[in-house]
């Protein structure tokens, strides 16, 4: 039997079935009962910077890169773009909205589409169909697909947008992940709002491990910093120097200035 209990379980719609833990796979049940489990600890997909975070965060540091991972990844033209890299975190303070039973963030929608256009224009040698956009919320997926209809022909036709579940078991050269969840200081209930299943470690693991060459995360660090798991990614991004403040960015001219220590502290404390 082969499986990964650190990735998404079966989708359960029945509350009764959920109460009986029908979302637990046979693999998990056997593991819990003490059956021997062997970890396949070598990965051939992700670049070293992303795989290190995934390994440390979800596999106790046991996931190792194949010895030829740098040759497998190669040195694509994408890396010649100073705005891109192995891992990029884009901060934006756009507002979340609850529509039709799901969440959306229109500022993130605009930003994601602009990033797709930036990649297409700055790296013409790259097949834009190798760019995928993931969001955990169906409403955000809908809004992203609608917005992409107004993008340039190649971007509109070839960039795939889907939920986390829709991308499990798959990969793209570039993955852009839209976190959606955010808030503003004007919201009197902002301190009582969680980030929902965005904080689920299995969902986070799948979302961030689909990218081969470049992972771009779009989100509000002030909101995400409430989660220990997302705080770890934010701190890791800051340490690597790839955390950018995107508020006010219009696209097509490279990324704006990176966040310095004072700025990131200012953003995190803004809502306290």
Stretches with model-predicted labels:
Residues 1-272:
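Conserved helicase motor core of SF1/SF2 NTP-dependent helicases
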């Amino acid at each position: 039997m082969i499986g990964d209990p650190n990735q998404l379980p079966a989708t359960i719609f029945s509350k009764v079935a959920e109460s009986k833990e029908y979302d637990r796979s046979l693999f998990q049940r056997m593991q819990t009962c003490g059956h021997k489990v062997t970890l396949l600890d070598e990965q051939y997909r992700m670049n070293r910077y992303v795989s290190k975070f995934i390994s440390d965060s979800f596999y106790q540091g046991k996931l190792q890169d194949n010895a030829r991972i740098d040759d497998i990844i190669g040195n694509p033209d994408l890396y010649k773009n100073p705005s891109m890299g192995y891992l990029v975190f884009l901060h934006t303070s756009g507002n979340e909205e609850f529509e039709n039973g799901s969440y959306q963030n229109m500022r993130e929608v605009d930003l994601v589409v602009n990033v797709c256009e930036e990649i297409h224009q700055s790296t013409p040698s790259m097949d834009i169909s190798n760019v995928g956009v993931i969001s955990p919320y169906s409403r955000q997926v809908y809004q992203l697909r609608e917005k992409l209809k107004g993008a340039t022909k190649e971007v509109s036709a070839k960039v795939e947008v889907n939920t986390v579940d829709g991308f499990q078991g798959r990969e793209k050269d570039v993955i852009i992940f839209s976190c959606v969840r955010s808030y503003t200081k004007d919201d009197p209930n902002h301190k009582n709002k969680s980030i929902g299943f965005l904080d689920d470690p299995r969902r986070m693991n799948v979302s961030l491990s689909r990218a081969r060459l470049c992972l771009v995360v779009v989100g509000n660090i002030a909101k995400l910093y409430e989660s220990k798991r997302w705080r770890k990614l934010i701190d890791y991004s800051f340490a690597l120097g790839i955390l950018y403040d995107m508020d006010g960015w219009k696209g097509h001219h490279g990324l704006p200035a990176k966040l310095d220590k004072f700025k990131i502290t200012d953003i995190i404390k803004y809502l306290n």
